[in-house]
């Protein structure tokens, strides 16, 4: 088995959500079997709302990004979690 790079979009609950604090919360819940690749990037959406883009390297095993998606979804201030891309490296 190899590794997979996954780009995940995390939508905050509102424009008022403190993105710096949310980034720290996201970093704190990254599962042990996943590694953060690069920085967490802010992506403008509309009307001042910004999404966070997280790139993770995970092992290509059953479940893949699910543990990370579930952990991110449980973070206070997160509205939605979506895998944008996933590919073998």
UniProtKB/Swiss-Prot annotation:
Can the keyword Ribonucleoprotein be found in this entry's annotation? no
Presence of keyword Repressor? no
Listed GO MF terms: translation elongation factor activity
Instruction: State the UniProt keywords alphabetically.
Output: Elongation factor, Protein biosynthesis
Q: Which Gene3D superfamilies match?
A: 3.30.70.60
| InterPro entries hit by this protein | eEF-1beta-like_sf (IPR036219), EF1B_bsu/dsu_GNE (IPR014038), Transl_elong_EF1B/ribsomal_bS6 (IPR014717), Transl_elong_EF1B_B_arc (IPR004542)
User: Which positions form S-S bridges?
Assistant: none
Cleaved signal peptide residues = none
| Family designation | Belongs to the EF-1-beta/EF-1-delta family.
What role is this protein assigned? Answer: Promotes the exchange of GDP for GTP in EF-1-alpha/GDP, thus allowing the regeneration of EF-1-alpha/GTP that could then be used to form the ternary complex EF-1-alpha/GTP/AAtRNA.
UniProt-recorded name of the protein: Elongation factor 1-beta
Q: Which organism is it from?
A: Methanosarcina acetivorans (strain ATCC 35395 / DSM 2834 / JCM 12185 / C2A)
């Amino acid at each position: 088995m190899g590794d997979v790079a996954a780009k995940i979009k995390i939508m905050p609950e509102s424009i008022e959500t403190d993105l710096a604090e949310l980034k720290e919360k996201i970093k704190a819940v990254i599962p042990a079997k996943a590694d953060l690749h690069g920085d967490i990037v802010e992506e403008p959406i509309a009307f001042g709302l910004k999404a966070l883009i997280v790139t993770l390297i995970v092992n290509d095993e059953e479940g893949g990004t699910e543990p990370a998606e579930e952990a991110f979804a449980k973070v206070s201030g997160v509205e939605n979690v979506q895998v944008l891309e996933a590919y073998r490296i």
